[in-house]
Swiss-Prot record:
Similarity comment: Belongs to the MnmG family. TrmFO subfamily.
Name of the protein this chain belongs to: Methylenetetrahydrofolate--tRNA-(uracil-5-)-methyltransferase TrmFO
Organism encoding this protein: Streptococcus equi subsp. zooepidemicus (strain H70)
Pfam families: GIDA
Enzyme class: transferase
Underlying gene: trmFO
GO molecular function terms listed in the Swiss-Prot or TrEMBL record: flavin adenine dinucleotide binding; tRNA (uracil(54)-C5)-methyltransferase activity, 5,10-methylenetetrahydrofolate-dependent
Keywords assigned: Cytoplasm, FAD, Flavoprotein, Methyltransferase, NAD, NADP, Transferase, tRNA processing
Cofactor: FAD
Length: 444
């Protein structure tokens, strides 16, 4: 093919992963990132692969679909997984990272790579000079989004998601919280803020009546279930919170807890969990408390949480609009455009939802862009694997009802033979098959 490089637009998780996979295969990359010359509403730094919502890569067990996907990515030499592993922070059975250390590591490795040229500028049109991976994310600039939407017949999709507040640990009242992971799984990694029924009811009332930051009048409120604002969840009813981010099961009071409780109950009525957000352990985020409340309201309402009475918020929660494509119509399983075979898309804009899923899409798109450059057939991972099932799902879903999707065992091809009734055993069997099939596919 008569060209000497591949473009990658956007240095988020997907773009960073794509650029690395291309360069690893000996092909020069021009990696474009506008942060540094033009800010986005949500990013705080100019580092690559910045985490703008939670600092968690979610479950790490192979009986969890995202845990399986992470293991597959490790075996495929993912730069995102490698940097994440190097900057882990305690999170029980989950994988969480020091967001700044991790992002700096990804940035440094790509900046130092001899085949990666970093170009800090905004791209406003779809390049025609070379094979291109577009990974501009859900916060794609308006000018480029218009060009991408033109591929979609002008019909763009969107949803809103939000980020949770972060507090300074030194301002937490440690007499009202206790360190524990749910069911004592893994190390004790979460600060737990227990509530009595009276405290919970007062908190719920304050949350459901608090003032939200306004949306544009012409935009409907449309949320992705996995990142729903806590106030929207609260308005669905008390049980939604008690069976969701504030569920108390597995978080019994420690024997030495001296705070208020309901009678002799060993388990609180509700619990708010705080998760370590940086390696130093000086910052904690409020787990599951993505929010779109006005900042003053966040301070008022969230200081009702036991232990946070005088907490200082180093970052308030924010909400932003995310755009995504009609992937069932527009993309192949290799994340290649059906309309322009020299064009690939990756990341949340394709309808994959989550950090790990975005990295996975970037890995697949990057590998396939490199294979096109070398005039090789694209890789289509088997849908018995997590990394194969995700692109299969987003390219085979019903276009009329297509919405972003996290990886889960429900989208991975079922096992052959009689159904294994025990869920843990079934998931273990799916994971074992996935890793075996991935290894076999890569040796063909």
């Amino acid at each position: 093919m008569s060209q000497s490089y591949i473009n990658v637009i956007g240095a988020g998780l997907a773009g960073s992963e794509a650029a690395y996979q291309i360069a690893k295969r000996g092909i020069p990359v021009k990696l474009y990132e506008m942060r540094g010359v033009k800010a986005t509403p949500q990013h705080k730094t100019t580092h690559f692969a910045e985490l703008v919502c939670s600092n968690s890569f979610r479950g790490d067990s192979l009986t969890n679909a995202v845990g399986l996907l992470k293991e597959e990515l490790r075996r495929l030499d993912s730069i995102i997984m490698r940097a994440g592993e190097a900057h882990r922070v305690p999170a029980g059975g989950a994988m969480a990272v020091d967001r700044e250390g991790y992002a700096k590591a990804v940035t440094a490795e790509l900046e130092a790579h001899p085949l990666v040229e970093i170009i800090r500028e905004e791209v406003t049109d779809i390049p025609s000079d070379a094979i291109t991976v577009i990974a501009t994310g859900p916060l794609t600039s308006d000018s480029l989004a218009e060009k991408i939407h033109a591929l979609n017949g002008g019909a763009g999709f969107y949803f809103y998601d939000a980020a949770a507040p972060i507090v300074d640990k030194s301002t937490i009242n440690m007499d009202r919280v206790y360190l524990k992971s749910r069911y004592d799984k893994g190390e004790a990694a979460y600060l737990n803020c227990p509530m009595t029924k009276e405290e919970f009811m007062a908190f719920h009332e304050a949350l459901t009546t608090a003032e939200e930051a306004p949306l544009n009048a012409f935009e409907k409120e449309k949320y992705f279930e996995g990142c729903m604002p806590i106030e929207v969840m609260a308005k669905r009813g008390i049980k939604t919170m008690l069976y969701g981010p504030m569920k108390p099961v597995g978080l019994e009071y420690p024997d030495d807890y001296k705070g208020p409780r309901d009678g002799d109950f060993k388990t609180p009525y509700a619990v708010v969990q705080l998760r370590q957000d940086n390696a130093a352990g000086s910052l904690y985020n409020i787990v599951g408390f993505q929010t779109h409340l006005k900042w003053g309201e966040q301070k008022r309402v969230f200081q009702m949480i036991p232990g946070l009475e005088h907490a200082e918020f180093v970052r308030y929660g924010v909400m932003h609009r995310n755009s995504y494509m009609d992937s069932p119509k527009l993309l192949t399983q290799g994340f290649q455009s059906r309309a322009n075979h020299r064009l690939f898309f990756a990341g949340q804009m394709t309808g994959v939802e989550g950090y790990v899923e975005s990295a996975a899409s970037g890995l697949v798109a990057g590998i396939n862009a490199a294979r096109l450059f070398k005039e090789e057939e694209p890789l289509v991972f088997p849908n018995t694997t997590a990394i194969g099932s995700l692109p299969y799902y987003i390219t085979h879903a019903d276009s009329k009802h297509f919405q972003p999707m996290n990886v889960n065992f429900g989208i991975i091809k079922e096992l052959d033979g009689p159904r294994i009734r025990d869920k843990k055993e079934r998931y273990e069997a799916i994971a074992k098959r996935a890793l075996a099939d991935l290894a076999a596919y890569l040796t063909v």
